[in-house]
């Protein structure tokens, strides 16, 4: 059962209710023979009198939401309300709560102790401080009669956390609770996170300064006794290091620093902090990560409070060291709180700091208001569509004027306080400046985006086309030799195509290199567009009517570049997300492109079903490589401070002024890069065969979207396809590929006009005399050759294509080489070429090398279908018979 001792508004519970509460929690632990029942049957007061001084009070201070209530509940078996992190983080304990420790817990068992005679009562009336007069007023009859009780109650106080959003900068209530706690407790627990050791604000060292100051106020009287000092127990929570000594040494140095910085009475001028406190330290393991070790440390710490035989027992006296009997505790608390609430000097650390803070805050608000009024005028002019040249320079000059005025008004105050408020003023001034500059920059960025948006989106399509060209010529790592087995009949073509397709094994490492090449190419092409936007002098076709303004305002120019870069990144990501949502259609489009066009961009025709069957595996492989490129977004928008690619906007930042707004804009500069970390480098699809779905990288952990992680890994918001979506896309893709392949096979079979194999030998046998006559007559031979070249050219070409598709590679490749050489020689002799054969061959070879290096670096492939050649020809639309798409959006 808990008592709300002090509510959030600073109201203490009534004295009568305090008495009733203490009676209700203490009476069960007191033997009836120990209590002195009155004539009115008031057994409760007798129970409190029976306890006398034989009790202890423990309190806890610390930052808000730092686990104070959790620690007390585990340590003393109390039931204070704890923070529910699933709902929100905020204030849980408001004011102060009191509860009785569960003495049935291991380490807190009741033990027989002798009650020490009250030592402080005779001198209480002689104390001079107002708080100690309250003590004397409360302790009027502090002698306890009868034998001591069998148990020593332990009262636990849970105080409101400091540094909370609800209180804001108001530290008055915090200091009042600190003074109230020190006037009550025997042991004060300071709850501190181990990671905050060495910090001032995060470790709540301002609270410790308050505790030291108010404790000096309590004991600045002439009758001060050296034994009259509480125990300060510093508990370091979530400690994960092996050696606590460095952290404890740092904590002690922080205490000494605070102690030396406060103003002390003459009697404590040359003393250390140990003159006012018994300092103790304890470290506890992580509450969540080391739950068992944490509970073990709780049991150990509990013995410090309950086992008098423990070497670290905290209560040097077996009785309440303030000398206040339990029946006088309600009056003592009431008088102490009344004295604290009327003490106005508790509102501030010192009068001098208060005055400096008040004056600096007033000057800061005045200058900030003046600047905002100034900036609002320019913002209104921008809303009216005015063209403001050198706007950033005007705003920077006004910022300097406001900061100079602030320093002039506060030059006589504490430099530390002035510096703090000056930094706050500068930050808020720059924020107001950026608000105006962003309004102008967004208008310019809109103009730029309207002119280059299509180029950014085309870079995605161009990178995908280059990926398909490289994937189309990527050889398989292993597979059956399809050239040794030919279908016996035309109706077995579908079965043979399926067998050939499943027999191919993909080169997984080469496919992953192609995926990396796709993202590297995409990042380079987007950077080229960004570089054009950042080029000086600015391009008129990009900036339009803002070109003159951009030349005269470098800060605005770089701010526009920041906005444009971010917009490019978002547009590219949006486009890739859209492609991933319809991954099956995107893959099938790549399959159709690879099946319909050669690697050089020319249209591909199949004279036989065998040629079509040989081209299908490479086309299917190209679509699977596209899937590997779509399932994770690999571009990043990184700060220019951490990016190695600083050559992109050297011209944009070279002439940038060193003003405050320019520094902010430069700090916000980002680059679009492709840079996989260690986790992302392993987050690629693994390929085996064409009839097996790519293996999803399940061994690489992917955090949830709401998980706050500082370590570098796979970004959850960049995963475009889950494992289920990847498998589903593969299955739909295979179905569409099979359907398209069947249609093409049937079309090839229907258009097959090849002569039967016995026709050619029969013609030679039956027409041997005529053939011999033609061969022996030069004029007739020339006439026949001309007629065949004119009227039967297409027939011979189709037969040659059929031979290329069906003939053995050992024969096709040499014959093709000879034919190409003869064709080049004839064209050079006829003078219709673009130079000599060696020159053109060298030029074509260099173009091929340059194209390969530029499009897909780090991927070495050999053509298995056609000779690669450079081409800038726009790819035509695929044939209508190959358009069999449906809109499937994958979850």
From Swiss-Prot:
Q: Where in the cell is it found?
A: Endoplasmic reticulum membrane
Annotated GO molecular function terms are: GTP binding; GTPase activity
**GO biological process per UniProt:** endoplasmic reticulum membrane fusion
The domain of life for this entry's organism is Eukaryota
EC number of the protein: 3.6.5.-
| Record bears the keyword Protein transport | no
Transmembrane stretches in the record are 755-775, 779-799
Q: Is the keyword Transmembrane in the record?
A: yes
Lumenal domain ranges by topology:
776-778
Compositional bias per record (Basic residues), positions renumbered to this chain: 882-891
Polar residues: bias regions = 863-880
Q: How does it sit in the membrane?
A: Multi-pass membrane protein
| Function of the protein | Probable GTP-binding protein that may be involved in cell development.
Recorded protein name is Protein SEY1 homolog
Which species is listed as the source? Leishmania braziliensis
